[in-house]
Design a protein with these regions (language model features):
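Hydrophobic, aromatic-enriched alpha-helical segments typical of multi-pass transmembrane helices
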Residues: 2-246
């Protein structure tokens, strides 16, 4: 049996009618995911963004940024990561569906890890609670109200922007990519791109956590990991759309 004939058989086995819509949604979501790292970089180069971001030192600075540039404030507190993780959810479900015939247990393990990581990350996000506090601060009528809201915002900033769920999400995607390497549905190139990208970003998280920042070498690793993940999104998205059309 030729390679193309084998692929047709695999597609026929995998693309059950009830799952085709999920494959299409997951494929489109994966392709959209490519835009998020590009948007993150593009925003950094917009005029005035660097100055506004560096000016957020106190909680009042943050409230002012929220009132004048709410999108930038949300973005600085991880908005694109939040939206990106949400977009990745249907893609992970679609990958699990494609893998369930041959590797259901490991696929389910990776999928569960992903959603646990997503829940932890969303629960620890400071973006929307800070937006709510800034809105209340803007309409507060007494000094006591403003002082109370400022104290609540300061406590939130003191806790820091939680990234506890991000390494878990990356590890889940690493598990899923490893499973695809052993399966027949996705190409080896797709699996390797996912393994490399997620492994590198896990290393970046470890470096950033242990050193309290990201040295130049860490930025290089992050760029390589980001490019690998973008490649993974493209390859996964294309393959899922193929399954959705079968």
């Amino acid at each position: 049996m030729s390679q193309s004939e084998l692929r047709q058989v695999i597609d026929a086995e995998t693309a059950e009618p009830g799952w085709k819509s999920l494959y299409k949604v997951g494929g489109i979501a994966a392709l959209i995911m490519v835009a998020f790292p590009l948007a993150e970089v593009a925003i950094n180069f917009l005029p005035g963004v660097a100055g506004l971001s560096q000016g957020t030192v106190t909680v009042i600075d943050w409230f002012t940024l929220f009132q004048n540039h709410s999108f930038l404030a949300l973005r600085n507190l991880g908005l694109l990561n939040i939206v990106g993780a949400a977009f990745l959810a249907p893609t992970i479900l679609a990958i699990y569906s494609a893998l369930r015939r041959d590797h259901e247990a490991y696929g389910a393990f990776g999928t569960i890890l992903f959603f646990v990581g997503l829940a932890v990350y969303l629960a620890g996000s400071r973006a929307f609670p800070m937006l709510s506090l800034s809105s209340q601060y803007a309409v507060a009528t007494t000094d006591a109200q403003r002082a109370l809201l400022a104290a609540a915002g300061q406590a939130m900033l003191a806790e820091g922007q939680s990234r506890a769920g991000i390494p878990l999400i990356e590890f889940a995607c690493l598990v899923i990519s490893t499973v695809t390497l052993r399966g027949r549905v996705f190409s080896k190139a797709t699996a390797c791109a996912g393994i490399l990208g997620n492994a590198l970003l896990i290393i970046v998280e470890i470096i950033a956590t242990s050193s309290g920042g990201l040295p130049n070498a860490g930025f290089v690793i992050a760029i390589c990991g980001g490019l690998s993940l973008m490649t993974w999104y493209l390859l996964v998205g294309r393959r899922l759309l193929q399954l959705g059309r079968t």
